[in-house]
Structure formats: structure tokens, C-alpha cells
Amino acid sequence: VVTVDCSGYPTHACTLELKPLCGSDNQTYSNKCGFCNAVAQSNGTLTLSHFGKC
């Protein structure tokens, strides 16, 4: 199981750093910040599928 530590999120500003992650919703998130904000909005139902683009 691949995991990402999302403690400290959500945050209001994310960098534009490109380190893509693929979520369980089959959506590519540009970086950990964007992914973790989406996890927070989903109340924890969104999980990491794998690192890299979907």
C-alpha cells in the first residue's frame, strides 16, 4: 500500500512544483499539496493509487 503523509493539510497555497500523484479517483494531482487538499475535501475517502500520472 502506497501512502502519503497529509498531516498539516489542507493548506491555502500550493506550489507549482510538478511531482504528480494518481488518486483513487483516477485523477492526476500535480503534487502532494494538491493531492492532500483533495483528500481533506473528500473527508479521507480519496487515497493514493500510485506516484506518477494516472
Swiss-Prot record:
Signal peptide: none annotated. GO terms for molecular function: serine-type endopeptidase inhibitor activity. Glycans are attached at N43. InterPro entries: Bifunctional_prot_inhibitor (IPR051597), Kazal_dom (IPR002350), Kazal_dom_sf (IPR036058). The record marks L16, E17 as: Reactive bond 3. It comes from the Eukaryota. It is found in: Secreted. Its main location: secreted. SUPFAM superfamilies: Kazal-type serine protease inhibitors. Keywords: Disulfide bond, Glycoprotein, Protease inhibitor, Repeat, Secreted, Serine protease inhibitor. It holds the Pfam family Kazal_1. GO terms for cellular component: extracellular region. Residues 4-54 form the Kazal-like domain. Disulfide bonds join C6-C36, C14-C33, C22-C54. Avian ovomucoid consists of three homologous, tandem Kazal family inhibitory domains. This is Ovomucoid. It comes from Leipoa ocellata (Malleefowl). The lineage of its organism: Eukaryota, Metazoa, Chordata, Craniata, Vertebrata.
